[in-house]
Amino acid sequence: ISFDIDGTLEVGDPPGCITMDMVRRAKDLGFIIGSCSDRTVTNQRNIWRTHDIEVEFTVLKHQLELVKEQFDASEYNHIGDTNIDQQYAERAGFTFFLPDQSLQNFWPSAE
C-alpha cells in the first residue's frame, strides 16, 4: 500500500483519516507499505522515523512506477486524496482509493 501524506494520513497537512496505528496494522497484516508524496523523500522518511514505522519505500508522486518495478506483489494500491494522486496511481498501474474508501477495503473494523 502506497500512502499519500497530506490529506490522507493523520500527520498530513491537512490531516487525513488514516491513523499511524492503521498503517502499523497494515504492515502487521503483511502489506508492503510506504509513501508516495510531493513532500521530499527526506521529509517522508522523517515522518515515518518519528512514528517508529519502518517502510519499504518513499518516493515522489511521479516515481510511483518505480515501486511496482521494485516489488513483486499480487496487487498495488495507492491511497490519496486528490485527482493528481489518482492520475499518478493509475499511470503506474496502481488501484486508487480515496482515504475514506480505503477504510472498508483495508480496515473494515475502523469505520
Where are the regions that the model predicts?
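Short hydrophobic beta-strand segments
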Residues: I1-S2, H78
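Alpha-helical substrate-recognition element adjacent to the catalytic core
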Residues: S2-H62
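Short secondary-structure boundary/hinge segments and terminal tails
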Residues: Q44, L66, F106-P108
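Output/docking surface of receiver
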Residues: E56-Q63, F97-L103
